[in-house]
UniProtKB/Swiss-Prot annotation:
Gene: AGTR1
Annotated SMART domains: 7TM_GPCR_Srsx
Region (Disordered): 335-359
Protein's job: Receptor for angiotensin II, a vasoconstricting peptide, which acts as a key regulator of blood pressure and sodium retention by the kidney. The activated receptor in turn couples to G-alpha proteins G(q) (GNAQ, GNA11, GNA14 or GNA15) and thus activates phospholipase C and increases the cytosolic Ca(2+) concentrations, which in turn triggers cellular responses such as stimulation of protein kinase C.
UniProt-recorded name of the protein: Type-1 angiotensin II receptor
Biased composition (Polar residues): 335-350
Matches recorded under PROSITE patterns: G_PROTEIN_RECEP_F1_1, G_PROTEIN_RECEP_F1_2
Length: 359
């Protein structure tokens, strides 16, 4: 609930109806610490993912294209995280100027949409590869994957435009601090409603439903195949992996989406209780830490579903350089069914079972 006051020296001066909301000493210590941890772990992990996929795996599969772009999107966001750490440590005083305020804010929004869209495409690709491997072969090409990623980056950039346009540096007169924040000229504006609903629906609900549907259909197809093979342990493993993927996405983002919706209600003046505003403003940076920390782990999480990725990742940690030239045959194992003959029965007499792997 922020009301416009005046403009001076190019910086708008405003009043905050709840000046103490979210301003707690433990937040100013805990959140910068968590941001620093996310920055170090995220930069290290995602950089290794980029190196493994591009230099070791040679970017030969559709899913590897999505994983590479996922890691790159995370790195773009992580580069701005130190700014937010300093901002929070300085008790929400923005010292970096208006341009960095816009760029850093747009980076957060860009990462949200790019990551969610890429994970959604990855789930669709996995569904097509496992449930319809033959029918989808002509559609699931490297060219299609790269064009899809370009479109995703453009859409994420478009979704980030409101942050560039409406996020600015403001001077709050009744607290005497300069903040980097959204500010709406009128509480009757439909803009916060539109942005909030876009974030809730396009940035979470629709992608989650697609991811849930894709992996449910994958599990049913694999369950049927393993029942024919009477391979119950393998079936249980696949179920656990799929459940982990779906729940990992859901619980990473649902807290942030809920408090984003509540924040919109506060901005519109529908919620006027400063106690509720304090809860929302206190919880928001915590939910951001949960969402974006898990987001930055996604490339590693998905990558480690594949044996080749794990193999090359461990080689990289041991400083074993990639081979100058790959002699492996053209493989689509990362995004198609792989088959393993039974140890006890000849492959000519027993149909092999499909394998859910990311390689």
């Amino acid at each position: 609930m922020i009301l416009n006051s005046s403009t001076e020296d190019g910086i708008k001066r405003i009043q905050d109806d709840c000046p103490k909301a979210g301003r707690h000493n433990y937040i100013f210590v805990m959140i910068p610490t968590l941001y620093s941890i996310i920055f170090v772990v995220g930069i290290f992990g995602n950089s290794l993912v980029v190196i493994v996929i591009y230099f070791y795996m040679k970017l030969k599969t559709v899913a590897s294209v999505f994983l590479l772009n996922l890691a790159l999107a995370d790195l773009c966001f992580l580069l701005t995280l130190p700014l937010w750490a300093v901002y929070t440590a300085m008790e929400y005083r923005w010292p970096f100027g208006n341009y960095l305020c816009k760029i850093a804010s747009a980076s957060v929004s860009f990462n949200l949409y790019a990551s969610v869209f890429l994970l959604t495409c990855l789930s669709i690709d996995r569904y097509l590869a496992i449930v319809h491997p033959m029918k989808s072969r002509l559609r699931r090409t490297m060219l299609v994957a790269k064009v899809t990623c370009i479109i995703i980056w453009l859409l994420a950039g478009l979704a980030s435009l409101p942050a560039i346009i409406h996020r600015n540096v403001f001077f709050i007169e009744n607290t005497n601090i300069t903040v980097c924040a959204f500010h709406y000229e009128s509480q009757n504006s439909t803009l916060p409603i539109g942005l909030g609903l876009t974030k809730n629906i396009l940035g979470f609900l629709f992608p989650f439903l697609i991811i849930l549907t894709s992996y449910t259909l994958i599990w049913k197809a694999l369950k049927k195949a393993y029942e024919i093979q009477k391979n119950k342990p393998r079936n249980d493993d696949i179920f656990k992996i799929i459940m982990a993927i779906v729940l990992f996405f859901f619980f990473s983002w649902i807290p942030h989406q809920i408090f984003t919706f509540l924040d919109v209600l506060i901005q519109l003046g529908i919620i006027r209780d400063c106690r509720i505003a304090d809860i929302v403003d206190t919880a928001m940076p915590i939910t951001i830490c949960i969402a974006y920390f898990n987001n930055c782990l996604n490339p590693l999480f998905y990558g480690f579903l594949g044996k080749k990725f794990k193999k090359y990742f461990l080689q990289l940690l041991k400083y074993i350089p990639p081979k100058a030239k790959s002699h492996s045959n053209l493989s689509t194992k990362m995004s198609t069914l792989s088959y393993r003959p039974s140890d006890n029965v000849s492959s000519s007499t027993k149909k092999p079972a499909p394998c859910f792997e990311v390689e």
